[in-house]
């Protein structure tokens, strides 16, 4: 899915029922295919096409507010929800005493697909983080998101767990790295408040 296109702005914070967006996600190149219709993620277990390199919409069949784009992309759940791995992955780090709002920070490396080797972080108001070293399938739960505090943020990181834009970020900045994650998530079927059509859907180029 490593593609580029131009930026269109959307209105501010909007509530999203991710289940309604599922067809758009399923149609995107590289998205995990069949959905059981039972609130699952489309992952069908070991040996499936999902396990071999396709990706899932981590918010499918859930209701979230899409927030701002900064170092990553902010979301607020309307209920307690599982946070799901986008693809087959290895958890590189899991910290419940970080300096992030809410104190929680987890990062994982994708092991299959056209984003193989890319590292994704999930941070902020979480609980029950999966420990470092765990390997997970597409759509498998890696943490629980709580409908309180600052919600969660999802973006690109390096193997040490530093966000890609950390070295150049100032509070409230809409970074290139954040737009890249927004593009990737939107292609999977997740809503974003600003569709970054000119940004690539993977971590490359300017950090901020």
Model segments located where?
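Short, compositionally biased
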Residues: 152-170
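Secretory targeting and sorting signals
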Residues: 1-27
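Polybasic, proline/glycine-rich intrinsically disordered low-complexity segments
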Residues: 167-181
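Internal hydrophobic scaffold segments of catalytic domains
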Residues: 141, 148, 158-160
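Short histidine-centered loop motifs in beta-beta connectors
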Residues: 76-79, 84-85, 110-141, 145, ...
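Surface-exposed, glycine-biased beta-strand/turn segments
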Residues: 27-106, 137-138, 178-208
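Zn2+-dependent peptidoglycan hydrolase active-site motif and core
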Residues: 86-129, 149-156
